Amino acid sequence: MAALNMVRQGLFGEILHGGCGYEHDLREVKFNDGTHYNYVPGSGDLRMGPTAFAEAQWRTNHSVHRNGDIYPTHGIGPIAHCMDINRGNRFLSLSAMATQSRGLHKFIVDNGGENHPLAKVNFNLGDIVTSMIKCSNGQTIIVTHDTNSPRPYSLGFRVQGTEGL
């Protein structure tokens, strides 16, 4: 809300670019022991799907069956307001790409061993997905999705204009 207020007051000048995303280490949420919400370090009991608990029942399956930004709205909402999307501006084109998928497999091997049954799962979701959006009024947006890497939480929020960021 503060950044949107600053945009509306013209403090950034003409808006040129935005950055946003969902960058949150969810590896301990995507696997658990079937009774705890998060993975219990040192237990070696890693589950996903029907035998898991809470989000590990459904969230991890997206990492198996999809490859793309599976949660773009988390970050794009505030940027869309700042760029007047659906108020005279619109998304014109999008190009997205993903890195290879390594983080979840490494987490399984590091915590359950190379012979853990989940070590055989083929994860399709790239560890980092980057989407580039071009707006009809000329602005660009970079959206980043990263939930499979060891990292601090970040929405990567950035508004940049002719007068600064």
Where are these regions (language model features)?
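Predominantly a Rossmann-like dinucleotide-binding segment in NAD(P)-dependent oxidoreductases
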Residues: M1-N122
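A structure-centric signal for secondary-structure junctions around beta-strands
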Residues: I15, F91, D127-I128, Y153-S154
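NAD(P)-dinucleotide binding in Rossmann-like oxidoreductases
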Residues: L118-G126, S136-L165
